[in-house]
Amino acid sequence: MASSIVSSMFLFLLLLLVFPHIDNVLGARMELRELGEINYADPLGFTRPIVPIHVPGFPPRRPTIPQLPPYRPRRCPFCYPPPPPKAFPKNSPSH
């Protein structure tokens, strides 16, 4: 019984902490919707696009990639069994 009281109190406190934030977000959305309907103009009268700063004379830095040695597969003596012996070898001594 004590655990249910503690869990319900925790849930209540969590709702108290979260609810004002949700209310602020919903209020901000409503304000943005109202401003969009009013067709609000910028007080300065223009908007300036953000342009990245480019310093001439410096080439862009290329990312450094570590150089790996070339991959050479090594022979594994236990991976493949030796071929079976031939039934009729070419250089067999004749009787």
UniProtKB/Swiss-Prot annotation:
It is found in: Secreted, Cell wall. Maybe involved in defense responses to X.campestris, but probably not a X.campestris pv. campestris race 750 (e.g. Xcc750) resistance gene; according to genetic data, linked to a locus influencing resistance to Xcc750. Keywords: Cell wall, Secreted, Signal. GO terms for cellular component: extracellular region. This is Protein ECS1. Residues 1-27 form the signal peptide. Expressed in leaves, flowers and stems, but not in roots. The keyword Signal applies. Absent in the susceptible ecotype cv. Oy-0. Only present in ecotypes resistant against X.campestris pv. campestris race 750 (e.g. Xcc750). Induction: Accumulates upon infection by the phytopathogenic bacterium X.campestris pv. campestris (both compatible and incompatible strains Xcc168 and Xcc750, respectively), agent of black rot. Accumulates at higher levels in light than in darkness. Repressed by MIF1. GO terms for biological process: response to bacterium; response to light stimulus.
